[in-house]
Structure formats: structure tokens, C-alpha cells
Amino acid sequence: MTQEIDIEKYHQLALQKQKEHRKVLANLKKKPPKNLDKIAQEIHDEVFQEIDCTACANCCKTLGPDFKEADITRIAKYFKMKLPAFEAEFLQVDEDGDKVFKSMPCPFLGGDNLCSIYDVRPKACREFPHTDRKKIYQINHLTIKNTLTCPAAYLFVEQLKDRL
């Protein structure tokens, strides 16, 4: 059985270390090590050996993905729905003009913290918390923001800090 994750504990830790994390990531941007992508991938893999997303699902409960047209088309097809019907049932346009869920938590998140559309989930969900992307220093603002929601993102930055 998966052990539940204390989301609030990680949120508080991320708040306490936000200034330190910003500094670490800013230094990476100024002078990224040649092997940064390799180090980041190793840390990402290690963190996700420790953190089981299904014991948390905080991203699914509190953050809504930005739906791209390809996401909408793929998911509507999965449900055998016409695009306008899918959008009318699940999506709205936010103040930035992005298509997002009408309400949170994610309507496709089950009580067991599993995604009912996992194989066709939006790209933003597949890539979250973006800690395995190349040139991680290009998304410092997003990485810092994600540490406040995602225990794995917090641990990623902590381990990155310790390795560099």
C-alpha cells in the first residue's frame, strides 16, 4: 500500500526555502554545468523512485492543465464526443485566453488518486512537474512555482542544490 504524502509539510518547506531555491536556480541559469541535463535526469529519476504521485495527486486536485487543441481532440475522441460538447461539459476560457477545467479537482481524478484518462491525458499533465526536461534553467519560474504544489519538485530542487 502506498504511504500518503504530507502535502502541507512540503508546501511549508518550499515556502521556507523559496529564496534559497531561487538563488540556486538563478545561478544555474548564469552558468549551467555542461552535464546539467544528465544530472537533472538522474535526480528526477531518483525523486520519482521515492515519491509516488498516486499517494499525492495534489497537482490534479489544485492545478488545472492548459488544454491545447491536440489535447482536446484526443480526449474528446476517447470519450466519443464532439469537440464542442466536450468543451461545453468540461472546459472554460480563463482570463489569459487559455482553455482550462471549469472546476477543480480534475473531473478525471478518481477517489483512488488515479487518472481515468491516463493514456490520453493532456500534455501538461504528462510533463508535470517538468523536472526531466532539457535545459531546466529555462523554466526557473515554473520550477519554483511547482515546488509549492509538488513534493517531487521540491525534492528535485533540494537534491539539485546538494549536487551542484
Language model segments and positions:
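Short loop/turn segments that flank or connect secondary-structure elements
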Residues: 1-164
